[in-house]
Amino acid sequence: MKEKEMIFGIRAVIEAVEAGKDIDKILVKRGLSGELFSELLELTRMHEIPMQNVPVERIDRVTRKNHQGVVAFTSAVTYQKLEQIVPLLYEEGKNPFILVLDGLTDVRNFGAIARTCEVAGVDAIVIPARGSVSVNADAMKTSAGALHSIPVCRERSLKEAIVFLRNSGIKVVTATEKAAELYTGTDMTVPVALLMGAEDTGVASEHLRLSDELVKIPQFGAIQSLNVSVAAGVLIYEVIRQRGELFP
């Protein structure tokens, strides 16, 4: 198990990125500039590492050490690359089953979803590098260790990831209340990627347009939506049901 740690100081952070250390995110003091900052900015873009510009007071709350306006948080897991995972699944003779999460920010929901994915045999989870959850202590705890077992792919562009999946012969099925078709009405015996959004914002419009099919889970009560981890569980086990994998 990897321990999550913090790295302080702009030179130390640059060296960590260059050394290939798995960085979850970097906080940078608002208004920071200079040659070293430009170098760090270029590295974060190259390695697809989320960077946030924040007031210096926020960094001061993290540490009293000489941080020079920069602190990096290492990841508790090693992120995988989708373009490496998918070919490997085909090489192993698997029928790819991937979950894509668009804009999910609740780490406990993420952990619960990861736990379901691991138990159900989902091959990988895809999240965007920015505007999404990170694998922190709460996510690890809620996942009950699942995040150590299932590959997590952090992608710079979710749009490009969806296009890659489709070009790889994987059907992208998106859960949205805007759908006309029920989730039981689409064929998920083929290679499939389930795309789900956050409870409040749903899936981005551009990602909806890229999807092969839109599906919904029927609702009969007054509450407008299911918890996203519950909805993910429903759809994941529908894939298993259709594939005849309920009784291994």
Positions of PLM-derived features:
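Active-site helix-initiating loop/hinge in glycosyltransferases
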Residues: G9, D102, N109, S225-N227
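Short, acidic/turn-prone active-site loops that include or flank metal/cofactor-
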Residues: G31-L32, V56-E57, R130-S132, E199-T201, ...
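Structured adenosyl-cofactor binding patch, chiefly the S-adenosyl-L-methionine
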Residues: I14, A19-G20, K141-A146, S205-P248
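RNA substrate-binding interface of SAM-dependent RNA methyltransferases
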Residues: E15-K21, S33, I49, P87-E181
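Glycine- and other small-residue-rich loops at beta-strand/loop junctions that grip anionic moieties
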Residues: E5, K29, D102-G103, P128, ...
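Active-site/ligand-binding-proximal alpha/beta "capping" segment
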Residues: V173-N227
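N-terminal positively charged helical leader segments and presequences
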Residues: M1-L88
